[in-house]
Amino acid sequence: MPTALCSIALALLVALHEGKSQAATTPIPEQPAPLPRARGSHLRTRRCSCSSWLDKECVYFCHLDIIWVNTPGQTAPYGLGNPPRRRRRSLPRRCECYSARDPACATFCHQRPWTDAVAVPGSGSPAAAFQDGKTQATAGELLQRLRVISATKIHFARQQQKPTRETRPTHSRQRKR
């Protein structure tokens, strides 16, 4: 029995050693050099810095070690630290890349205007559409549509709740007892 355990342990060590040597020969994508950190602090792995924390797509793209937790009201990011407000306000673009040689980051942050990602089709920006009152439907129309949808759902739910009774003949022998 001890020989079997020794051979399994030896095989595992050889496999780990082979994997380590292969990992050392594969090129690693460029990441920012780790800064000396204080004892107990956690260095966040980021590829860029978002100009707005409300832009969830940008936060998810830029912060590589973020943990997303599903909550009833929203998807809340954990593991974020707040950058200085001056820097956040001064960013004219969606985000700023830490490495100029990261093509995916450059495409995401600089070539695609982030206001167009949330814009109402056919308008310049969401704010302009609401200020001009040129939304696709007025508030009254939306309210009416919601009422119709709600009434339809209530009607459908009531139809589903009605028990289906089997029709019995009136001359059943069980009733005559």
From Swiss-Prot:
It is found in: Secreted. Expressed in various organs including heart, lung, liver, kidney, gastrointestinal tract, uterus and ovary, but not in spleen. Within the gastrointestinal tract, gene expression was detected in rumen, a ruminant-specific digestive organ, as well as stomach, duodenum and colon. The gene is EDN2. The keyword Cell inner membrane does not apply. One of its GO terms (molecular function) is hormone activity. GO terms for biological process: intracellular calcium ion homeostasis; positive regulation of smooth muscle contraction; regulation of systemic arterial blood pressure by endothelin; regulation of vasoconstriction; vein smooth muscle contraction. Keywords: Cleavage on pair of basic residues, Disulfide bond, Secreted, Signal, Vasoactive, Vasoconstrictor. Endothelins are endothelium-derived vasoconstrictor peptides. Residues 24-45, 69-177 form a propeptide. PANTHER family: ENDOTHELIN, ENDOTHELIN-2. The record marks 68-69 as: Cleavage. This is Endothelin-2. Residues 155-177 are annotated as: Disordered. It comes from Bos taurus (Bovine). It comes from the Eukaryota. Residues 95-110 are annotated as: Endothelin-like.
